[in-house]
Amino acid sequence: MGDFNSNEDNNNPFNNVLYNPYIVDLYDTTNNNNNNNNNNNIISGFNCDSSIFTQQISNTNNELTIPLTQSIQNLLPPVQQQTQLFISPNNNNNNNNNNNNNNNNNNNNNNNNNNNNNNNNNNNNNNNNNNNNNNNNNNNNNNNNDINTSIDINLNQLVYSTPSQQITNSVQPIYQCATQSTTSNIDTNINTINDNNNNNNNNNNNNNNSVNNNLLSMCQDPTLILQIQQLLLQQQLLQQAQQQSVPLNIQVPTTTTPINQQHQALLVPQQKQFYGNVSDNSSPETNFSYASPSSPSSTQSQSSPYEQQPLSPNPTISLSSSISVTATTTTRPNATEKTKESSLKSKSKSNEKDKEREDEEEDDDDRPKKRKKFDKNVYKGVDLGDELLEITSEEFQAYKNNFFANASDKKTVSALNYQFRKIKNRESARRSRERKATHVDELEAKIAEIEKERDNYKKENERLRMELDQYKLQEKQKSAGSIFDYISIGSPTTQNFSKNFGIILFLFLFGSFILTNTTPNFFNTNNGVINPNLVYNANSNNNNNNNNNVNRFSVNGVHSTQQYFQSQRNPLSNLDEDSLESLTASQGVFSTHFVPEQPSILLNRESIRNWATLPQNSVASLSFEKDNALKTIENANLDKSKHNVISNLNQLQQQQPSSDELMIDQKEEKNCNNNNENNNNNDNNKNSDDEKGKEIEEIKRKSTTTTISPTRYVNNSTISLLVNPTSVIGDIPDDLMKNSNVTTFGENSSFKFNFLIDTQNFPNGSNDISKAFFDNENQQMTVTSVIIAIQKSPKTPSQQPSTK
């Protein structure tokens, strides 16, 4: 009871009609695209007595038309719920009031009997109603053949009001009447609808009553009250569905055969999808087919007014019915729509889920992963797996002590040790990474600071360069009118250099000019040297001892002022023979050779053609015996003076041969005069010193007759003479000590002589210089450099020291 889908109501013709496959669907499911704008009109599960509609239709002459174009599409959008509109002929219409009352009473009695039977059996009475309707139709064939009423349902008037609102407005007085009634007998069979019985009862009461009276009688019917309550509940649901914009499909079944309700005709519109301007027609094409429920393939009735061509863009459907209109609504979804909508919903849900998953994954990537904390008191086996990446060595050691303290298996012990090593390595690597990161951060900070300092230094350098350029420009402008502008060429740095160079050059030239005019030859390297002369004491008569000879060195030196700052120097050509006397002998008196004021005996290198250079700054040491040293030095001085005179004479003879001859003659005459004088003196002193005079004459003759070959000289050699303390014999007179030119040798004393070495007699230079001084093998000498000329005379066995 109370359920449309229960097994008890399987034979109910009303339920069969709800699921009738031949119900007309005025709005095809394939045309859903054009009808998604105004989806607000829904009718579902409405079953009402046909007499209500017949009475209102008879009283109100409103034309109802159903358009199949955009108007109905906007009004009735596609939904899973489907609305069916049943229009069936009913013989018990109010128009039958003109018929005989007897027939109506019979029909009413039959209907009452049938209704009672149906109530007892708890079944729907639609079949009985159909039978009664058939009986009534048979009794009223003559009348019904004359009555052919056409009902035009114009749904354009319902555009601004939903079907649920229209139904509410039409049923509102019925609902008010039902609430005022106090009927307590309510049929528990809610699903049974007794439209024909209600109509027959109304006809039995008063066939001529108005619509209001019929409504009052209907208000007391409990089934109608329940139906109205259901309708109001459905209206609320429809309003909620409208707010959620749920589309609906409406099916409108129509019947046109007035004779037999079993063979009711149905309008089956077949619509094609409208593709705008692609098809030939501008509106959806609609084809109607006419068939019966029992024989779907039966031929169409010739009297059917629904065999029409495709309608215009705004068509209307004319529904002809002889008696009444029955409107019912059903909500059965279509299978194809279910699949499409389910697929769309599933796709949308899957897309939403995918988006949610992506968002969650992104959030998970951003968030730090939360992992379960390792519990060292829970046994998890030997191999901890991925937990080794998280736990510390202390936790692992505690876990090992809790569960594997007394482990004896080698595999477990090795596995635990291996895991412990891995944890240790991970921790050490982490610490090293941290240290590296800290060091890197520190280095980066230092680098940043250094870069900042470098940038600051660059800026400071640029600023200083700008200032320097400004100062240079200012100095250039100031020195524009100076004297040295003609020297300055180029940049300021080159100008300053050129100025300084010009000043230095000017000073150098000026100083050289002054030196050449006020000082001696500055550029001549042949400077003044010391001329050592030996003083030999020959006073043998006073001493009466020939062996006791006193050695004296007389140094005729040139003062410093005479050496380097004399404006004029005399060459060797200006020397006279008188100035060459190195020794003077007088009985019992020492006489020294006085150097003239002018350093005439200084060597002029212009007269020396051949020079040889020996090693510089070398040391020559000489050790002389008492007599040999004196003789050697004396002979060296004599040879030196003779060589200078001869060389000078040779030069003069080459220049002036006539004058040279005269000079030779004069010298010979002088020599003769000297000899004569000496002879005279000797004659006067024959008694005192005859023997000594003879010896002196012989020495002079030998010295004058000696020939000296031309020599070459070696420069820059020094000889050191070392004298033993026993070589000094006797006392030196006071007069001799007062003379600054005389130098005596004491203990460990030394004296240096500068000589020029004759390369002809000494071809090996200083290595052979000892031949000029030594006669014995016990004498040694090493020579470094010599400046003063030395010439060795040939040795004779009767050679004795000269007193001249």
Swiss-Prot record:
UniProt GO cellular component terms: nucleus
GO biological process: endoplasmic reticulum unfolded protein response; regulation of transcription by RNA polymerase II
MF (Gene Ontology): DNA-binding transcription factor activity, RNA polymerase II-specific; RNA polymerase II cis-regulatory region sequence-specific DNA binding
Region ranges (Leucine-zipper): 443-450
Start and end residues of each stretch annotated as Basic motif: 421-436
InterPro entries reported for this sequence: ATF_bZIP_TF, bZIP, bZIP_sf
Region (Disordered): 86-148, 275-371, 670-693
Low complexity bias: start-end ranges: 90-145, 292-334, 672-685
Xref: Pfam families: bZIP_1
Keyword DNA-binding found: yes
Lineage top rank: taxon: Eukaryota
Domain bZIP as annotated: residue spans: 415-478
Biased composition, class Basic and acidic residues, residue ranges: 335-356
Subcellular compartments: Nucleus
Compositional bias per record (Polar residues), positions renumbered to this chain: 275-291
Keyword Metal-binding assigned: no
Protein keywords: DNA-binding, Nucleus, Transcription, Transcription regulation
Main location: nucleus
Entry's family note: Belongs to the bZIP family.
Function: Probable transcriptional regulator.
This protein's name: Probable basic-leucine zipper transcription factor C
Organism: Dictyostelium discoideum
